[in-house]
């Protein structure tokens, strides 16, 4: 990626805008003031802007918002403006003008924020939609890439695989429509997590717009902010423009497989054994586990289906040998496996049977009402415990659990290396997914999810019960803006330490330095304490 040459040239003008008074525009409303503020650059740097007067406004707003819970006409306040930047200067100007005229700012890269925090607000707001901010520049020789924040994971996978002739990859999530900006800034893991760690572990540079409209990179932002955006949620500190990442070696041919087992076929014993194997296998082997429910042959009776999904960086012969040595009970056979490229494996896991070009399709995802929760498991669950889980699980309406094994590279990285702390000692992550199509079922579905999550508490991490930032869950707690900043911080620790453990206080420190007035905020954003030094010292918290 080549940095935008206009960025530094307009910075001084942006600073003047930020600190000048709104009366200079001689307008009668914040709406007009904001438009006038943007219009200064219209002739030289046209800023794509949409208001409710545009016929495409509603379509654009809903286009990449994935969760119908936050698209109800009665529950969602729409933005005053939608900005679709194509230049870095567009983002700079939008940040400065939004702050100047008292408008909240939301930034949407892929729309997969499961609590809608990237595209809804309780206050008048501007939304930056990065749908047209998607340049990807791959350097095969150096095994690096500059990726703009609006790019989807599928676009990254396709381009990296195509340009490297299937010799390079990027370790990140399974869903190809997820936006890179938010995914990497929260950690990001998928089928290469055991081999290479998180997506955020591959970051070697970044560009971000600060609250004052300045563009910073790794060298100019300083080590604390650079640390914070790689797993602490970049939207807490600014608007992430682009990442520079390391690309990782992958074998030209990988092996994939999927095996389904019901309770009647011995799933309980296999899931129990999986807990002792999946995080200890050779790091080239990934075996993810998905649990769903299915009807049995008996009317009204359900069972649990455990689906074991394999990715192996190598050929079938070697995978069969490893499985025979480590997990023969699963019974993996040659005809269960398929050899393909690493890029093709992403189509296989997500929408089997589609052509590889499917990874470029950002619009295929069916919208639904959605609730997600998460856990980390540090001790294997007993067979008796699993049986208790199944009894409650079949009471849900088509729930899903995704168990992602760790170990390997994840055990080798310190929990303080980045804000993401869930490293050595965690056997696997659990993602709980509730998915429904009828809004009238929302209360029932949410109550079941919360009840099941409560039951699972006995089997998962404790003190704190940890959670994954990219699976945001407002049930864990929200910011209280009606109290002092110190009390707000104390309340935020209830959920902040679940996501970040002992890294939460350092994130508060960074937030307090770079955004002391809390412009970049949402219901679960990092709270600043402008006088954090004295107050944290008073309760003997060492940052």
Curated annotation (Swiss-Prot):
Q: Which cysteines are joined by disulfide bonds?
A: 37-97
Instruction: Please indicate if the UniProt record lists Oxidoreductase as a keyword.
Output: yes
Give the position(s) of the covalent cross-link described as 6-(S-cysteinyl)-8alpha-(pros-histidyl)-FAD (His-Cys): 112-175
Q: How is the co-factor bound, per the entry?
A: Binds 1 FAD per subunit in a bicovalent manner.
Recorded coiled-coil stretches:
none
| InterPro entries named in the record | BBE (IPR012951), FAD-bd_PCMH (IPR016166), FAD-bd_PCMH-like_sf (IPR036318), FAD-bd_PCMH_sub1 (IPR016167), FAD-bd_PCMH_sub2 (IPR016169), Oxid_FAD_bind_N (IPR006094)
Q: Which residues are glycosylated?
A: 54, 74, 135, 142, 162, 295, 335, 440, 482
Q: Keywords in UniProt for this one?
A: Disulfide bond, FAD, Flavoprotein, Glycoprotein, Nucleotide-binding, Oxidoreductase, Signal, Thioether bond
Residues in FAD-binding PCMH-type domain copies? 75-250
Q: What EC numbers are recorded for this enzyme? A: 1.3.3.8
Q: Which family does it belong to?
A: Belongs to the oxygen-dependent FAD-linked oxidoreductase family.
Role description? Catalyzes the oxidation of different tetrahydroprotoberberines, such as (S)-canadine, (S)-scoulerine and (S)-tetrahydropalmatine.
- Give the protein name, as stated in the record: Tetrahydroberberine oxidase
